């Protein structure tokens, strides 16, 4: 199945210097994929000129006269940046000229513009940011990772529904297990919102296993972890910091003297496998779940490898038509929670 992905080439900390090589990398790896680079036409033409012959019509450029700055207020980006590379990328999804879009730009602006242009799916109040996280047993999906810092029980219920459908669609899991992130597994733990969301989910047809704690996330106890955006973002950033610390200590330990360096040389294959498994670039690319279209948010500081992975995520979710898949499964479940 051929898919077309629109790329915000001007977004992120590195802009076209990362987006263009990442696009070329993906096109070299994946067939039946077309990419649209959106940004400064002259700049982008210069970066892709030497590859024109081999790419043919698989890579096209669409000019954008504006870009959304990383520190720009979402309201300003929405009102004043109608010809920005971010806005045009989302517009292409809306007009079905692209099957998905990817941006490393300002998260708040991306969410505001995407929600304004694409709208949310019927029965969904707020989109959520969801991403795969590595676990001992493979990976799990965690949402929300920062789109909503104050979520109601109803929002959490909807996040659980969407996360379950996503895991089922992408990983072909018949009944994905779902857990609510909490300060304890006992039903008496947590604030009233968490308790109410737990009651709603326990009465649903989802494979809801109850509350899970932070240490359960990376043990792979559940397929889908649900939380509000404040908690999810703190948990995500904390885990990224721990991963960097572990890599630092390993590197430091193997460089203490000649003996440890030799031990490090012998352990190199194991260390490479460890680094690859824990490499955050392999998990770059978060879905703005709950919209009428596929929008993938890349980390703002992503390098070529990381941004290429975000494009691959967009291709997979576009081919699966995740929004349509969610819509088809949501109505009976939403009726259970009386949230339509």
Swiss-Prot record:
EC number: 2.3.1.274
Source organism, top-level taxon: Bacteria
GO CC terms of this entry: cytoplasm
Reaction(s) this enzyme catalyzes, per UniProt: a fatty acyl-[ACP] + phosphate = an acyl phosphate + holo-[ACP]
Subcellular location: Cytoplasm
Listed InterPro entries: FA_synthesis, Phospholipid_synth_PlsX-like
GO MF annotation list: phosphate:acyl-[acyl carrier protein] acyltransferase activity
Keyword Cytoplasm assigned: yes
Main location: cytoplasm
Keywords on record: Cytoplasm, Lipid biosynthesis, Lipid metabolism, Phospholipid biosynthesis, Phospholipid metabolism, Transferase
Gene3D superfamilies, sorted: Isopropylmalate Dehydrogenase (3.40.718.10)
Cleaved signal peptide residues: none
GO biological process: fatty acid biosynthetic process; phospholipid biosynthetic process
Pathway terms, separated by semicolons: Lipid metabolism; phospholipid metabolism
Entries under Pfam families matching the protein: FA_synthesis
Ranges in a coiled coil: none
Subunit and partners: Homodimer. Probably interacts with PlsY.
Family under the similarity heading: Belongs to the PlsX family.
The protein's role, per its UniProt record: Catalyzes the reversible formation of acyl-phosphate (acyl-PO(4)) from acyl-[acyl-carrier-protein] (acyl-ACP). This enzyme utilizes acyl-ACP as fatty acyl donor, but not acyl-CoA.
HAMAP family according to UniProt: PlsX (MF_00019)
Record protein name field: Phosphate acyltransferase
Organism: Nitrosococcus oceani (strain ATCC 19707 / BCRC 17464 / JCM 30415 / NCIMB 11848 / C-107)
